[in-house]
């Protein structure tokens, strides 16, 4: 699909959906103090920008701001925004960040645990590693950030929520933790990716979500988890290009980060009297609530070399009809099928793929 054929229209539709979400939830989140970890770039930055537009007081917390100085300046020039340096594995840094937020805004209403270490940053972006090929150190590093770091952040920022008997925590996890629900299909169609120990950390955070939600329900705090699905996060472009060099299309055309905004606004407005202890798959939630299916949020303004990758994949993928509108498969199973079939076509067989690596 070329930009001239669908990019402009898709972008206009996406903007319309974003505006609708802002209009629907602005009254609920305006004035609320929302902390977003990993807020300097990618999904986190997108959420911060959207939440600011909704009238929230937004704290973007991140370990590094080296390539995001423009956003930091934007936040610091906005009376409703704040940028903080915060390593979620460092107790002192977390304490200092919490104190700075309280000094500035007086409280915390919402915590979005978006920061995490992904496989693509712990390991080379291509090449296969089985679970038994990983080391204890790999697991310690990944769990240190994704599980213990998340828990450390919750311990600090839930304090003002419990004190005011109202708040919301949103944990970002991964749809890959539900691979068993697809009969192992997730791994079967992505044997060239490294899923462990990353998926194990996200499974741990999912379990944490369910138990913590019940434990703090009496304190007025909602705790939920969201699975974004295939999204153009900050690491995505480099990974897709690395796979393309080996003749593999990396999964499917990603969604823009803004597709997380509608559900994030919804959850930011919750407390324990509303939705809590739940796990949401973002593309399905969007569709169920009138915010379009996955295809409506796919990114059609990728760099030219990446457009070539995904146009090639889409040319080999059958479309289907939903509500009378032709789309590419949008759900998890459809995405896996599309990626698997396209890569089989490119590689001829998994055997030849293995021998190439």
Curated annotation (Swiss-Prot):
Alphabetized GO MF terms: fluoren-9-ol dehydrogenase activity; NAD binding
Biological process (GO), any one: fluorene catabolic process
CDD domains: SDR_c
Record-linked InterPro entries: NAD(P)-bd_dom_sf, SDR_fam
Entry EC no(s): 1.1.1.256
Sites where the protein binds NADP(+): 36-67, 87, 202
UniProt superkingdom: Bacteria
PANTHER family noted in UniProt: SHORT-CHAIN DEHYDROGENASES/REDUCTASES FAMILY MEMBER
Function noted in UniProt: Catalyzes the dehydrogenation of both 9-fluorenol and 1,1a-dihydroxy-1-hydro-9-fluorenone to produce 9-fluorenone and 2'-carboxy-2,3- dihydroxybiphenyl, respectively.
Name the record gives this protein: Fluoren-9-ol dehydrogenase
Natural source organism: Terrabacter sp. (strain DBF63)
Gene designation per UniProt: flnB
């Amino acid at each position: 699909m070329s930009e001239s054929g669908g990019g402009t229209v898709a972008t206009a539709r996406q903007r319309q959906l974003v505006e609708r979400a802002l209009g629907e939830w602005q009254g609920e989140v305006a004035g609320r103090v929302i902390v977003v970890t990993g807020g300097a770039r990618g999904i986190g930055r997108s959420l911060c920008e959207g939440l600011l537009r909704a009238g929230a007081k937004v704290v973007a917390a991140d370990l590094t701001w080296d390539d995001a100085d423009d956003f930091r300046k934007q936040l610091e020039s906005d009376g409703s925004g704040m940028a903080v340096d915060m390593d979620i594995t460092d107790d002192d840094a977390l304490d200092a960040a919490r104190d700075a937020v309280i000094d500035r805004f007086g409280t915390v209403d919402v915590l979005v645990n978006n920061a995490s270490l992904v496989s693509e940053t712990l390991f080379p972006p291509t090449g296969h590693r089985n679970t038994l090929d990983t080391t204890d150190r790999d697991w310690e590093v990944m769990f240190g950030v994704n599980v213990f770091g998340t828990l450390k952040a919750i311990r600090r920022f839930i304090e003002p929520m419990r004190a005011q008997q109202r708040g919301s925590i949103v944990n970002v996890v991964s749809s890959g933790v539900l691979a068993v629900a697809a009969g192992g299909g997730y791994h079967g169609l992505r044997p060239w990716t490294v899923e462990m120990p990353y998926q194990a950390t996200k499974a741990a955070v999912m379990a944490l979500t369910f138990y913590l939600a019940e434990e703090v329900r009496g304190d007025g705090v909602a705790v939920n988890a969201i699975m974004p699905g295939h999204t153009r996060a900050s690491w995505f472009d480099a990974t897709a290009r690395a796979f393309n060099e080996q003749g593999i299309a990396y999964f499917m055309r990603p969604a823009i980060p803004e597709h997380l905004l509608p559900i994030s606004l919804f959850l930011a407005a919750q407390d324990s009297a509303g939705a809590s202890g739940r796990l949401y798959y973002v593309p399905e939630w969007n569709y169920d609530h009138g915010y379009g299916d996955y295809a409506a949020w796919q990114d059609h303004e990728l760099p030219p070399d990446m457009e070539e990758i995904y146009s090639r994949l889409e040319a080999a993928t059958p479309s289907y009809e939903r509500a009378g509108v032709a789309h590419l498969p949008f759900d998890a199973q459809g995405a896996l099928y599309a990626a698997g079939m396209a890569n089989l076509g490119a590689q001829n067989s998994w055997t030849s793929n293995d021998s190439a690596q």
